[in-house]
C-alpha cells in the first residue's frame, strides 16, 4: 500500500505540473501573418497590406493640398506597416488608447505613431478612432536610421490593457517583403474582385503630361523642378461593381525605386476622345464604364531612369508592376 501511495502521489504531481505549463501558453504572443486576417478577439481584426520605407506617410488620394508625415531628421527614414483594421466592438474605438505598435531593431524599441486614412482616401490624421464595427486603413510607422533597415525587424502590436495585455508579433527583413506580393508586367490585367479591372498599358518618362489630341483650351501638367521627370503608368480601368466609383478610389499606386524609397501618385483621367485631362478624384466611373487613368509620379531624373517598379494596392491585395 505504501508503494501504491507513492506512485499515485508522483502521478498527481506530474499532472499538476502539466496543467500549469499548458496554462502559460495562453499568454504567449500570437504570430501576425501577412495576407491573412489576424485578430484580437472581441476587439479588432486586421490584415497587413504592406510593409515599406516611405519618404512620407500620405493619404491614398493625392490632391492639390494634403497633410503628410515625414521624418523629423532629413537623414532618417520611416518604417511603415499598413493594415486594414476593423473594430469588432459596437462602440467607437480610439486607437491610441486601445493598441500600441512597436518596432524592435537590434534590441532597441521604436514606438510607432499611428495615422488613419479617411474612407474616401483623401485625408490622413494621426491617431484617430474607428467607428463601431467600422474599417479603415491604418499606418503604424516609426523614424529610424536607414542603416537599421538592413537588419531583422520585429513588429509588435499590443493591446493597452494593464490587467490582461495581449500581444501579436512578426519578424521580417524588409528586402523579403516583396515576396508576399503578386508580380505583374505591362499588358497584364489586375482584377480586383467585385470592384475593378486594371489593364496595364504603358510607361512613359516625360517632363510634361498632356492629352493625346488636345483641342482648344486644355489642361496639362509640367514638372515642378527641372531636375525632375514624370514617370507615367497609363492604364485602362473598368468599374465591375454595381455602383458608381470615383476613379481615384479604384486602387492606390506608389512608385518604388531601387533603394525601396516610395513616391505617391497623382492620378488623372484622360477623356475618351483624348482631348483633355481631369483629376481622377473628380471623375466617376459608372458600373461597366472604362476610362484611361494615368498614375503620375514626379521623381528625380536619376530615379526616373533607374531601376523601379509600381506597387498597386487595394483592401489588402498587393501587386508589383515590373517596369
Enumerate the language-model features and the residues they cover.
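Sec-dependent N-terminal signal peptides of Gram-positive bacterial secreted proteins and lipoproteins
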Residues: 1-25
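Conserved functional micro-motifs across diverse proteins
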Residues: 20-80, 84-323
Amino acid at each position: 500500500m505504501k508503494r501504491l501511495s507513492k506512485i499515485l502521489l508522483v502521478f498527481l504531481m506530474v499532472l499538476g505540473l502539466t496543467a500549469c505549463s499548458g496554462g502559460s501558453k495562453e499568454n504567449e504572443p500570437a504570430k501576425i501573418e501577412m495576407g491573412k486576417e489576424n485578430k484580437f478577439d472581441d476587439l479588432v481584426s486586421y490584415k497587413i497590406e504592406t510593409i515599406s520605407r516611405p519618404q512620407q506617410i500620405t493619404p491614398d488620394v493625392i490632391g492639390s493640398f494634403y497633410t503628410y508625415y515625414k521624418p523629423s531628421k532629413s537623414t532618417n527614414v520611416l518604417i511603415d506597416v499598413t493594415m486594414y483594421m476593423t473594430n469588432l466592438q459596437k462602440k467607437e474605438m480610439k486607437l491610441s488608447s486601445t493598441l500600441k505598435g512597436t518596432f524592435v531593431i537590434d534590441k532597441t524599441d521604436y514606438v510607432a505613431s499611428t495615422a488613419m486614412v479617411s474612407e474616401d482616401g483623401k485625408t490622413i490624421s494621426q491617431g484617430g478612432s474607428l467607428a463601431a464595427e467600422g474599417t479603415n486603413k491604418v499606418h503604424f510607422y516609426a523614424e529610424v536610421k536607414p542603416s537599421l533597415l538592413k537588419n531583422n525587424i520585429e513588429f509588435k502590436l499590443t493591446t493597452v490593457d494593464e490587467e490582461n495585455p495581449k500581444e501579436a508579433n512578426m519578424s521580417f527583413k524588409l528586402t523579403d517583403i516583396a515576396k508576399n506580393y503578386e508580380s505583374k508586367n505591362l499588358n497584364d490585367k489586375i482584377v480586383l474582385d467585385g470592384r475593378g479591372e486594371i489593364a496595364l498599358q504603358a510607361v512613359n518618362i516625360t517632363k510634361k503630361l498632356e492629352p493625346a489630341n488636345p483641342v482648344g483650351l486644355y489642361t496639362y501638367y509640367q514638372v515642378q523642378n527641372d531636375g525632375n521627370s514624370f514617370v507615367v503608368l497609363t492604364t485602362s480601368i473598368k468599374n465591375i461593381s454595381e455602383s458608381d466609383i470615383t476613379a481615384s478610389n479604384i486602387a492606390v499606386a506608389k512608385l518604388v525605386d531601387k533603394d525601396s524609397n516610395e513616391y505617391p501618385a497623382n492620378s488623372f483621367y484622360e477623356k475618351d476622345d483624348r482631348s483633355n485631362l481631369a483629376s481622377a478624384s473628380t471623375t466617376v466611373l459608372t458600373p461597366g464604364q472604362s476610362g484611361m487613368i494615368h498614375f503620375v509620379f514626379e521623381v528625380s531624373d536619376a530615379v526616373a531612369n533607374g531601376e523601379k517598379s509600381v506597387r498597386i494596392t487595394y483592401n489588402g491585395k498587393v501587386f508589383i508592376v515590373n517596369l
